[in-house]
Curated annotation (Swiss-Prot):
Family the entry assigns: Belongs to the LpxB family.
Name recorded for this polypeptide: Lipid-A-disaccharide synthase
Gene, per the UniProt record: lpxB
Its EC number(s): 2.4.1.182
Pfam entry (one): LpxB
Origin superkingdom: Bacteria
Lineage of the organism: Bacteria, Pseudomonadati, Pseudomonadota, Betaproteobacteria, Burkholderiales
Origin species: Paraburkholderia phytofirmans (strain DSM 17436 / LMG 22146 / PsJN)
Role of this protein: Condensation of UDP-2,3-diacylglucosamine and 2,3-diacylglucosamine-1-phosphate to form lipid A disaccharide, a precursor of lipid A, a phosphorylated glycolipid that anchors the lipopolysaccharide to the outer membrane of the cell.
InterPro entries in the record: Glyco_trans_19
Functional pathway: Bacterial outer membrane biogenesis; LPS lipid A biosynthesis
Length: 389
């Protein structure tokens, strides 16, 4: 009687909500590409778990932002990484896929690769935006890099890292022409009149730092445009509670807070005031004028300023290679500055048409059927491993 082959085992780690989205997309592609019975496990969030992923540790334990802010969490995070490394070395997977979270994943991928376990990393860290030798760390840790932006592959291949451009799953998910009126109907918002979506972040540290400034800016804008309304998505009940003191201190605001549905809220808007992050790419794919902002603690900001060499932080500007939307950061992010810039984005119809053209071209470049393309690369890495002597 012939022995049945062991099922494939795909270990994955995602450490952020944006990574959970990317990993869930990849899992959809893998389940249609790899044999039935393939096991998927590791560290993941709710979107991954919804696909049948077995999360050994909660993703939230890794979801910490900022150099200084992360220090107090380091012992717990290292403990999780060491335990997962022990498990994976004891029972090697067919492949390990790290999704974003480079500081955590590269430290795990390196020893796994040294032990002969093939490693794939999904989302190249910003080697094109930061100084330093991170690309050397990538070369030691990663067998194959899945790139979501087209200009990344040449940089990696020059350093000897195999890389494939797979596009960005958000570009597959978001329609080329957003349905603004449909989004307003779905959220119960009025069909006429200007609406600004405001997204101050999802962590307490972010809300504490920039939330009061965003709310003060909203009040200034409404004073200048009395018929203006705002929509703000709260991803979780905990975030809604964090926002409550700010909402209570601005009782006159025409503000609707939605339960999640960030993409729908942005689709419904005429312009967006948004904290820097992946959500700015989502806003660009929705063809929306926007103002990008952030505030981080002083020391974190100094470290970021010294490490970075691109003049912009927002993904729409990085992808365009120039400032196409304003960025107002750190101490420059006053309520007045944000209000003036956001109202200008709202009112300038020529700028709106220009941005629509730029963002539509960007959308076509990023729309690559990412889930299937990424799954094909992972499957090929597994096949190569099978062929090793």
């Amino acid at each position: 009687m012939a022995l049945q082959p062991s099922p494939l085992r795909v270990a994955m780690v995602a450490g952020e909500p944006s990574g959970d989205l990317l990993a869930a997309s990849l899992l959809d592609g893998l389940t249609s590409r790899l044999p039935a019975g393939t096991q998927y496990y590791g560290i993941g969030g709710p979107r991954m778990i919804a696909t049948g992923f077995d999360a050994h540790f909660p993703m939230e334990k890794l979801s910490v932002r900022g150099y200084v802010e992360a220090l107090k969490h380091i012992p717990g995070i290292l403990g999780i990484r060491n335990e997962l490394k022990r498990q994976l070395l004891a029972e090697p997977p067919s492949v390990f896929v790290g999704v974003d979270a480079p500081d955590f994943n590269f430290g795990l991928e390196h020893p796994l690769r040294e032990a002969g376990i093939p490693t794939v990393h999904f989302v190249c860290p910003s080697i094109w935006a930061w100084r330093g030798g991170r690309i050397k760390k990538i070369a030691k840790a990663v067998d194959h890099m899945l790139c979501v932006f087209p200009f990344e592959t040449a940089l990696l291949e020059k350093a000897g890292v195999a890389a494939s451009y797979v596009g960005h799953p958000l570009a597959d998910e978001i329609p080329l022409v957003p349905d603004t009126l449909g989004a307003r109907r779905a959220l119960g918002l009025a069909q006429d009149g200007p609406i600004i979506a405001v997204l101050p972040g999802s962590r307490r540290s972010e809300i504490d730092l920039i939330g009061p400034t965003f709310f003060a800016a909203m009040e200034m804008m409404q004073h200048q445009e009395p018929n203006l309304r705002f929509v703000m998505p709260a991803a979780t009940p905990a975030l809604r509670e964090m926002l409550r003191p700010l909402v209570d201190s601005h009782p006159g605001l025409a503000l609707t807070i939605t339960d999640g549905q960030a993409q729908l809220a942005m689709t419904a808007a005429d312009a967006i005031l948004v904290k820097s992050g992946t959500v700015t790419l989502e806003a660009a794919l929705l063809k929306k004028p926007m103002v990008i902002s952030y505030k981080v603690p002083w020391l974190t900001g100094q470290i970021m300023r010294r490490q970075g060499y691109l003049p912009y932080v927002g993904l729409p500007n990085i992808l365009a290679g120039r400032f196409v939307v304003p960025e107002i950061l750190q101490h420059f992010a006053t309520p007045q500055a944000l209000a003036e810039a956001t109202l200008k984005q709202l009112r300038d119809e020529t700028n709106r048409r220009t941005l629509t053209e730029i963002f539509t071209e960007m959308h076509h470049v990023l729309k690559q059927n990412t889930a299937q393309r990424a799954a094909e690369v992972v499957a090929s890495v597994i096949e190569k491993r099978k062929g090793r002597p």
